[in-house]
């Protein structure tokens, strides 16, 4: 569509293709928008601050089909606008006249129709100008391309023209050359018509020149074709070679990459190999140094071996010489033995003559029985009958006398070997110190085998006599095959064994002697510090009466009554065969230490009891068990007012307290401190432990406040020092009967035992947790300390098992069965136990002969009945607490593991069970209490009925 304006006025123009005929070029917008057949028109309007930028097409926003929008494009895009140059020029001139119409727009801006018309005209003009510009651009492009093509053709034509000119010049030169050569070859002749001749020669020359040029041109073309073919062939070959070369390069790169990977791995392996080589080099160096050292050691060992071989040869020579000397000494020894036994027989005969006939002392080879025992009488009678019946030859009698002492010594050594001293007995808590002390006391020269020394040995009389009779029978059979004068069977090593035993015995004796000297010095020093040396004690420290001050000895050895006498040094050979006899003083002390209470009230000359004081008490006066003793404060406090067990300060008094010293009787008190092992020998609670305090045979329980101590489980092997700290070593077993206690209680004879600690020693024992007293318990002062009481109670502590709980490996089943049988017997025969226990002892009869005529049952009427609110009896006031409670026996249904046992002395609770092991603990003297372990319950200390007594007789 084209609008042609002339001088600003619209004119009718020729109809253009794509437009309707007869339509004005300038039409109204209404005319355009009224057509309903027009499609949706694409429209875009970019309103920016810059100059308006128009696009001919927009693919995003479509206008609406009504008159508010201009439907563009007015001309179809497919319409071909073919304008002439004149039309285009006139149209552009029309566009240049738009500046003149600006004023018209400003004047008519209020007329919306005029503005709309102007916009429509402007739109159409803009569209037309755009179409014109498109057509001009297309023509310009085609013309530019054609111009470039023509320029290229002109260049080629120019090159061809220059080439042709060059070839033409060359050809011209060649023609001139050929023409000159032809003119020279032709003879000179005068032509009639020279002008014709010249024309003909020039034509021939031109023909020849053209022919040669054509030939050369053909040759050059053929050569050019050949060269092109060769060039194409070379090109193809070059391409193939390049491909091969590229493939080769790729292969080389791949191989190079693989080689790099291999080099890296090989370098890593090389580094590892280098490290291994360095380490191996170090190891080689170290091994070489070790080889050098070992070679040096081997050389030194070789030299030493040679020296040892030489020493061995010398030792063998010396042994041969010593063997020869030993044989000579054996002969001399046999002669000495004969002389010795002859002297012994003479001495024995002289002693038998000098001794009075009334003496009931019968000397046994080992002194196993007391002098006035029935077993000693039977044995002596049997020996006399055997001696009368057997009329042996003098040689046999002499031989028996010679070897009797040696046999006895060997038997003692065998007895000691039954309980090995370095280690504990299996199934016992005893330390090796007791066994070594026992063996040394039995086998040393001046340890007498008469009296109570053997009576207190760990082997009891019955078992020991059975063993020794069996061994004596065996040895008697063996003696028939021996020759006179030989200390054993020929070829035996009796002498070497005896010498070895003597050396070990001497070492053991020296160590024990040093230990006992130190203990004695330390104890004497303690007594001197406490002022005990001024008490006028005339009792020898080695006697049985000094065990009150030497309680540590009895605690250590596990049995009291052993006489620690100083022993002299005798030759080793004489120690083998010398009769083990002591002095008259030793025999006297042995008689005093006999475990019987026959002369309990008899005064003995030269024997002063420590703290001796007569009691100014009327024997006819009757005392109740709940009365107060002399050392009480005098404040009568009833039992319901029991307080806590914390001790309070006790004011010092100048009164003498007889309850804190030994009882005032001229009797011999034997305290057999046996090691009683219960089936519950692990971590148990022992109630009470007397803490190695000397306990009188007769005494009230006024101050016997037992201390609950948590007993640790002692391992099997204890050293010498550990045995002193063992709590169960100090457990005391009283060997007196309960009937004597009642009789002495009724006669007013009483004593007390020092208890250093209060009830709370073990942090409130488990046995007293059910009752809390309300009154402070005043602890009594020890007999060796000044009259002072501590101001405060010591801190409570409890023994704990620091060592691993070893299995005690006891013969617990036999012990348990024995205790079970004893408990069953207690249940069956509880009514007749008191009569049996009293009738089994001659002690009661002896006491009755001294005027104590009251019956045991008479004292029971004074025992008050304890109610449950009074609390445990042991927490009562410090007066004479009742020892028996009329409530029957302690319940029998108590567990076997309870370690507390009620003793026969004043209601003391002791671990008086039964232990069965190799040591055979003996109950010496009077009867030993055999009862099951029971636990102290609230308000019950002991049963009213006596437990069954088992007498050794």
Curated annotation (Swiss-Prot):
A GO molecular function held by the record: myosin binding
Pfam families named among the record's database cross-references: HAP1_N, Milton
Residue segments, region Interaction with HGS: 359-509
Compositionally biased intervals (Low complexity): 786-796
Subcellular location: Cytoplasm; Nucleus; Mitochondrion; Early endosome
GO biological process: axonal transport of mitochondrion; dendrite morphogenesis; endosome to lysosome transport; mitochondrion distribution; neurogenesis; positive regulation of axonogenesis; protein O-linked glycosylation; protein targeting
SMART domains: HAP1_N, Milton
InterPro entries, A to Z: HAP1_N, Intracell_Traff-Reg, TRAK1/2_C
Chain residue ranges for the region called Interaction with OGT: 658-672
Domain HAP1 N-terminal: 47-354
Subunit (UniProt): Interacts with RHOT1 and RHOT2. Found in a complex with KIF5B, OGT, RHOT1 and RHOT2. Interacts with HGS. Interacts with GABRA1. Interacts with KIF5C. Interacts with OGT; stable interaction is not required for glycosylation of this protein by OGT. Isoform 1 interacts with OGT.
Described function: Involved in the regulation of endosome-to-lysosome trafficking, including endocytic trafficking of EGF-EGFR complexes and GABA-A receptors. Involved in mitochondrial motility. When O-glycosylated, abolishes mitochondrial motility. Crucial for recruiting OGT to the mitochondrial surface of neuronal processes. TRAK1 and RHOT form an essential protein complex that links KIF5 to mitochondria for light chain-independent, anterograde transport of mitochondria.
Disease note: Developmental and epileptic encephalopathy 68: A form of epileptic encephalopathy, a heterogeneous group of severe early-onset epilepsies characterized by refractory seizures, neurodevelopmental impairment, and poor prognosis. Development is normal prior to seizure onset, after which cognitive and motor delays become apparent. DEE68 is an autosomal recessive form characterized by onset of twitching and/or myoclonic jerks in infancy. The disorder progresses to refractory generalized tonic-clonic seizures, often resulting in status epilepticus, loss of developmental milestones, and early death.
Family: Belongs to the milton family.
Name this protein carries in UniProt: Trafficking kinesin-binding protein 1
Species for this entry: Homo sapiens (Human)
Phylogenetic lineage: Eukaryota, Metazoa, Chordata, Craniata, Vertebrata
Protein encoded by which gene: TRAK1
């Amino acid at each position: 569509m084209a609008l042609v304006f002339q001088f600003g006025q619209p004119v009718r123009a020729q109809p253009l293709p794509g437009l309707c005929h007869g339509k004005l070029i300038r039409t109204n917008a209404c005319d355009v928008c009224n057509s309903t057949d027009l499609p949706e028109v694409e429209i875009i309007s970019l309103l920016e601050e810059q100059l308006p930028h128009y696009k001919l097409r927009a693919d995003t926003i479509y206008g609406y089909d009504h008159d508010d929008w201009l439907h563009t494009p007015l001309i179809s895009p497919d319409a071909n606008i073919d304008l002439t140059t004149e039309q285009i020029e006139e149209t552009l001139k029309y566009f240049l006249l738009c500046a003149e119409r600006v004023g018209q727009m400003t004047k008519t801006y209020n007329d919306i129709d005029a503005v709309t018309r102007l916009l429509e005209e402007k739109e159409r003009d803009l569209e037309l100008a755009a179409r014109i510009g498109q057509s001009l651009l297309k023509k310009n492009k085609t013309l530019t391309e054609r111009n470039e093509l023509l320029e290229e053709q002109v260049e080629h034509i120019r090159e061809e023209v220059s080439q042709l000119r060059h070839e033409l010049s060359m050809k011209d030169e060649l023609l001139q050359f050929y023409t000159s050569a032809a003119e020279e070859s032709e003879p000179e002749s005068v032509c009639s018509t020279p002008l014709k001749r010249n024309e003909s020669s020039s034509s021939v020359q031109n023909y020849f020149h053209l022919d040669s040029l054509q030939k050369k041109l053909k040759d050059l073309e053929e050569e050019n074709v050949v060269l092109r073919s060769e060039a194409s062939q070379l090109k193809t070959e070059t391409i193939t070679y390049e491909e091969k070369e590229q493939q080769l390069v790729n292969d080389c790169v791949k191989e190079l990459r693989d080689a790099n990977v291999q080099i890296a791995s090989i370098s890593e392996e090389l580094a590892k190999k280098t490290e291994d080589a360095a380490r191996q080099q170090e190891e080689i160096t170290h091994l070489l140094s070790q080889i050098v050292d070992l070679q040096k050691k081997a050389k030194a060992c070789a030299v030493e071996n040679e020296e040892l071989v030489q020493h061995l040869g010398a030792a063998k020579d010396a042994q041969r010489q010593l063997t020869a000397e030993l044989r000579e000494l054996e002969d001399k020894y046999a002669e000495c033995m004969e002389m010795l036994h002859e002297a012994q027989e003479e001495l024995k005969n002289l002693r038998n003559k000098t001794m009075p006939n009334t003496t009931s002392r019968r000397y046994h080879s080992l002194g196993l029985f007391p002098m006035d025992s029935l077993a000693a009488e039977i044995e002596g009678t049997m020996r006399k009958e055997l001696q009368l019946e057997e009329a042996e030859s003098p040689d046999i009698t002499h031989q028996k006398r010679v070897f009797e002492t040696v046999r006895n010594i060997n038997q003692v050594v065998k007895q000691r070997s039954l309980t090995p001293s370095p280690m504990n007995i299996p199934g016992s808590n005893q330390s090796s110190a007791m066994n070594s002390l026992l063996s040394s006391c039995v086998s040393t020269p001046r340890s007498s085998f008469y009296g109570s020394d053997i009576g207190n040995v760990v082997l009891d009389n019955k078992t020991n006599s059975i063993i020794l009779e069996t061994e004596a029978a065996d040895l008697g059979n063996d003696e028939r095959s021996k020759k006179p004068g030989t200390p054993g069977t020929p070829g035996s090593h009796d002498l070497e064994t005896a010498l070895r035993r003597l050396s070990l015995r001497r070492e053991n004796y020296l160590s024990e002697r040093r230990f006992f000297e130190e203990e004695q010095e330390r104890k004497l020093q303690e007594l001197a510090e406490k002022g005990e040396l001024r008490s006028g004690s005339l009792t020898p420290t080695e006697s049985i009466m000094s065990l009150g001050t030497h309680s540590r000895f009895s605690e250590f050895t596990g049995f009291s009554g052993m006489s620690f006498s100083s022993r002299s040094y005798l030759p080793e050979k004489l120690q083998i065969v010398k009769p083990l006899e002591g002095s008259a003083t030793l025999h006297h002390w042995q008689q005093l230490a006999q475990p019987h209470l026959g002369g309990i009230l008899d005064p003995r000359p030269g024997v002063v009891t420590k703290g001796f004081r007569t009691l100014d008490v009327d024997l006819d006066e009757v005392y109740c068990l709940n009365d107060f003793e002399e050392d009480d404060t005098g404040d009568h406090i009833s039992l319901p007012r029991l307080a806590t067990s914390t001790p309070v300060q006790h004011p010092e008094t100048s009164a003498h307290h007889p309850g804190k010293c030994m009882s005032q009787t001229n009797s011999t008190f034997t305290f057999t401190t046996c090691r009683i092992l219960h089936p519950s020998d692990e971590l148990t609670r022992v109630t009470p432990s007397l803490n190695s305090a000397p306990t009188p045979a007769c005494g009230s329980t006024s101050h016997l406040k037992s201390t609950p101590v948590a007993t640790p489980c002692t391992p099997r092997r204890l050293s010498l020092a550990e045995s002193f700290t063992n709590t169960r070593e100090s457990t005391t077993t009283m060997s007196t009967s309960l009937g004597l206690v009642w009789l002495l209680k009724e006669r007013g004879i009483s004593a007390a035992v020092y208890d250093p600690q209060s009830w709370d020693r073990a942090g409130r024992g488990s046995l007293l947790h059910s009752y809390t007293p309300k009154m402070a318990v005043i602890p009594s002062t020890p007999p060796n300390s000044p009259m002072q009481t501590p101001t405060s109670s010591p801190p409570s502590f409890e023994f704990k098992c620091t060592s691993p709980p070893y299995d005690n490996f006891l013969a617990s089943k036999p012990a348990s069965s024995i205790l079970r049988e004893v408990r069953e017997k207690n249940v069956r025969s509880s009514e007749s136990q008191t009569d049996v226990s009293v009738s089994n002892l001659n002690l009661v009869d002896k006491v009755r002969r001294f005027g104590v005529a009251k019956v045991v049952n008479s004292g029971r009427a004074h025992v008050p009945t304890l109610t449950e609110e009074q609390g445990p009896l042991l927490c009562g006031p410090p007066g004479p607490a009742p020892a028996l409670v009329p409530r029957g026996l302690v319940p029998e249904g108590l567990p076997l593991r309870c370690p507390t046992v009620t003793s026969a002395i004043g209601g003391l609770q002791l671990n008086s069970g039964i232990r069965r092991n190799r040591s055979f603990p003996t109950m010496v003297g009077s009867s030993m209490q055999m009862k099951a372990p029971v636990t102290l319950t609230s308000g019950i200390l002991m049963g009213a009925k006596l437990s069954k007594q088992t007498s050794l007789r």
